[in-house]
């Protein structure tokens, strides 16, 4: 049952700041990577000094590159929501990563060595890399832009002019170049007429900023730090492995006689799914001395490099325990007909469940206003739900 919405602007908060970072205007042309004029720049005052929890090193990065940091924060925000989606049927469902204006890394579970900790580290690192690289390709960042260029701009323009002239005469004029990253992007078919062009996602810049922002520059001195840096690396590796080739057709009457192609990161949902698969096969690391951080893997280093690792057995997460980053499962909605992990039997840890008529208030009909807030209506939704005792 849907009641009439009541207009009420929510506070800006971290989410509003993040929307300001990346969704403040219509997307620029992804092919050309246009930098449209007229958008006020993000400054240190609007980004760095409004968010608590930045380390000294992160604050320095933010002061030097507030626009890139804003994109990184957006990436963390997206990563937390994707983490919640991927683990929505688990007892621990990433809700503890929502920091209320602080970075997710202040959550207690990220100071532990659980499988869930490993998954969270990889997801957050991937989110920063993905968001920064995407912002680069959209021309939103001062310090970076399009990624790899297959040829000089003059050569590219000359080639395009020759090709368009050939197309206007009803002929094809193939120009093809190899992928800049062998193995990371599918190769064109023999009948394809295409060239690398447009605006590639600058994955190198995104990876470097993710590493600088999240990894400590000092050598890791304990097992927890080594686990964090390793899983950060796995998250970024998954983004690189899932690069896609996107193309735009050119030609008369939509004939697609010629395609301009560029590298792009996939939707973040695909990144989340790939990391969720790695979570299911995460590797437990035995250690001689946790203070020394010495790994005692049972697998070859090459096999270990692309997998999530952890060194603590996870608790059952049934009860609330702030020291473990566990919110517990009391009050969680469950599926009484399911025998899977989202079923009331598993999710409620044997405590049983109640059937409640619940009215919740949710944000709806959101509009972004420049500058600088998101204005939403509040809608009331009434429904019957099964809730863990």
UniProtKB/Swiss-Prot annotation:
Keyword Lipoprotein: yes
Signal peptide limits: 1-28
O-palmitoleoyl serine lipid attachment residues: 253
Entries under Pfam families matching the protein: wnt (PF00110)
Free-text tissue specificity from the UniProt record: Expressed in embryos and in the mammary gland of non-pregnant mice.
Top-level taxonomic group: Eukaryota
A GO CC annotation given for this chain: extracellular region
Family: Belongs to the Wnt family.
Protein name per Swiss-Prot or TrEMBL: Protein Wnt-10b
């Amino acid at each position: 049952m849907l009641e009439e919405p009541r207009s009420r602007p929510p506070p800006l908060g971290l989410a509003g700041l993040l929307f300001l970072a990346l969704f403040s205007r219509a997307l620029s042309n992804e092919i050309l990577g246009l930098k449209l004029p007229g958008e006020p720049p993000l400054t240190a005052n609007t980004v760095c000094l409004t968010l608590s929890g930045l380390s000294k090193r992160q604050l320095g990065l933010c002061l030097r590159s507030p626009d890139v940091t804003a994109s990184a924060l957006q990436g963390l925000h997206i990563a937390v929501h994707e983490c919640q989606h991927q683990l929505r049927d688990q007892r621990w469902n990433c809700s503890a990563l929502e920091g209320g204006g602080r970075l997710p890394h202040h959550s207690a579970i990220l100071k532990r060595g659980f499988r869930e900790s490993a998954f969270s580290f990889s997801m957050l690192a991937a989110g920063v890399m993905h968001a920064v690289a995407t912002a680069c390709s959209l021309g939103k960042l001062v310090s970076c832009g399009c990624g790899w260029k297959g040829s000089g701009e003059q050569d590219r323009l000359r080639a395009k002019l020759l090709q368009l002239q050939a197309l206007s005469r009803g002929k094809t004029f193939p120009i093809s170049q190899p992928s800049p990253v062998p193995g990371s992007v599918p190769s064109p078919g023999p009948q394809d007429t295409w060239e690398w062009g447009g605006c590639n996602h600058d994955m190198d810049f995104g990876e470097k900023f993710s590493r600088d922002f999240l990894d400590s520059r000092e050598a890791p001195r304990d097992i927890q730090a080594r686990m964090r840096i390793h899983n950060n690396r796995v998250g970024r590796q998954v983004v690189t492995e899932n690069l896609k080739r996107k193309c735009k057709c050119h030609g008369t009457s939509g004939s697609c006689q010629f395609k301009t192609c560029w590298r792009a990161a996939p939707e973040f949902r695909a990144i989340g799914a790939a990391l969720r698969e790695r979570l299911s096969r995460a590797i437990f690391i035995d250690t001689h001395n946790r203070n020394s951080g010495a790994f005692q893997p049972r697998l070859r280093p090459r096999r270990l490099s692309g997998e999530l690792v952890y060194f603590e057995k996870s608790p059952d997460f049934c009860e609330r325990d702030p020291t473990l980053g566990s919110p517990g499962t009391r009050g969680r909605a469950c599926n009484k007909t399911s025998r899977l992990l989202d079923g009331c039997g598993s999710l409620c840890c044997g405590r049983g469940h109640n059937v409640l008529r619940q009215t919740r208030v949710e944000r709806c009909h959101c509009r972004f206003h420049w500058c600088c807030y998101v204005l939403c209506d509040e809608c009331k939704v009434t429904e019957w739900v099964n809730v863990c005792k």
